[in-house]
């Protein structure tokens, strides 16, 4: 048996180095090095706690803290040499700390395992990412409110089955996206609460024999509470899965919004125009102006769905406690957070710049018998049962299809052939303005309700 010594931190039990390919295969430093700031933050807090309980001297704590801050400076200046043979962000930083301050650096890991260390790092990182994402959601919602207020009176067709259904205002339509994003915001705030529980102190899986005071470390790191079970502390990735689930819902909303923007910018709809800075052209077709931002967001949604599925699959077969499988938690989590953050940023920049083509929207709303329900409701107010009214208006629509006339274009005599309850006052009901204005209740499309909803939305955002 070879007596060649391994240089790994755990190498005492081993009699030969790790195979070179296996070292590269099992290393995570190429992707987990982005946790460096949170790893250093956690280590400084851990060292401070160890000094408070007497495991480290104050001088040792100061040396560790000073060395770690210098290392952070090296990393941010691009002067840090990341080594694959040291496996991960934790051992790279610890090895460099020992190089800088000597044997004291080897004391940092007292009472701690990489198992609880990485679980803490990820939670710290995700907490910060959620805060950035929440700010981007708010910025997008502010843009939606501004555009909705400006377009509170702009009438467009509302759709079901992508067929003309009833007139709505463009402002009302935009506020539907505001509502979805509000739910996304709430979900992420809720996810942050469960993310912000500290596993540090769980050590490898059973806790530690040192007289640690976890509450001290938690307070230094801004955690709301400490985890109540060491086995769960090192093995739990629910918070990452929950984030990816919330991110998937948010991306699904952005994808649906993207689909509408793609449709609305097409020559077949022409409802809106996007500024050139949010579009690209074609290498062969000179006339093209492609809505690449919404198309790409629609496409990137699948990445986030994949991250959620990947993490669920990663965790479903693992026994307690920590397993090497969990190394695979970071890349999907990182990618999901990056994708959601960047997609929200793109939309927050783009939405306020949308230019509606009001006349085209209005003309589209005039087609497709969009006020048919209003005519049925009119007859109900005349005393007829709704089901009878539905049938009467259905016959009127059929007549309009064959005659090439929308309901508002028919004469009173033409309309009265379907019901003698129809009178001159029907024409006020059949206008687009009459249709949207009649839906004058909370959540309705009437322009004054749109403005009231915008005001409520601004109150909501200001309270965050």
From Swiss-Prot:
Pathway: Amino-acid biosynthesis; L-arginine biosynthesis; L-arginine from L-ornithine and carbamoyl phosphate: step 3/3. One of its GO terms (cellular component) is cytosol. One of its GO terms (biological process) is L-arginine biosynthetic process. The keyword Signal does not apply. It holds the Pfam family ASL_C2. It catalyses: 2-(N(omega)-L-arginino)succinate = fumarate + L-arginine. Keywords: Amino-acid biosynthesis, Arginine biosynthesis, Cytoplasm, Lyase. It is found in: Cytoplasm. Its EC number is 4.3.2.1. GO terms for molecular function: argininosuccinate lyase activity. HAMAP family: Arg_succ_lyase. Belongs to the lyase 1 family. Argininosuccinate lyase subfamily. This is Argininosuccinate lyase. It comes from Ectopseudomonas mendocina (strain ymp).
